[in-house]
Amino acid sequence: VYVHGKSYEIQPVTTIMSSVNQLVATLQTTRQSLDRSLLRLTALELDDYVTLADITGIFSSFEIMQQAKTELKDCIVKLGNQGKLVQMQLEQLAGSSMDTEYDLMIRDYASDSSEANAEKIRAELARMTPKDLSDPQHVAAVLGYDDLDEDSVMTPLGLRTLSRVSVVRDGVAEKIVDEYGSLQELMDDISEDPERLGDFGVNNPAILADSLYRMKGTKQGNA
């Protein structure tokens, strides 16, 4: 059978559903692990203590999610109308919010943080073998760095972390990052003058400052 110019072998629904169940289980397990890793990463970022090894493991998890997502989409096409529930599960586990977070994390750590370069990096990561994805030096090379080892300290821009704060509207995170250059520079400044964030379009600078300190696990002024 041909759908949108792509050929599909007709398989029994039971066979397809067996694959679906395995893929959904992979997505669930990997997503749980990824969420825990991202929470830990946020804390490390705010403490300025992220290493290349920390982000390598997370990029690997994102790619496991992407691969399972691609395979599950094929199953949904094969299931036709019976694939609606599976589609809902896919959106819940690996929807657009995950793609956005992946893009922002790449931009946070790439030597060139442009959206166009992030797209190229995602394509390169998708082509890498699981072995290469687990190798910090291979990942560093894709991000645009040479001569780094797994213990090398990585300084994020802060796009991903800022995007998690509700008072940071679309486009505001970019302005903040352009001004400060790194999340740590931002943290250093808001400890002295949080209201300055209002200059970049943050309607409630105190809320943003408080949110960042809560993520860090400290109270404002005691960092």
Which positions does each model-derived feature cover?
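Long, highly charged, low-complexity intrinsically disordered interaction regions
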Residues: 9, 23-222
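Conserved catalytic cores of phosphodiester-cleaving nucleases, focusing on short active-site segments
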Residues: 1
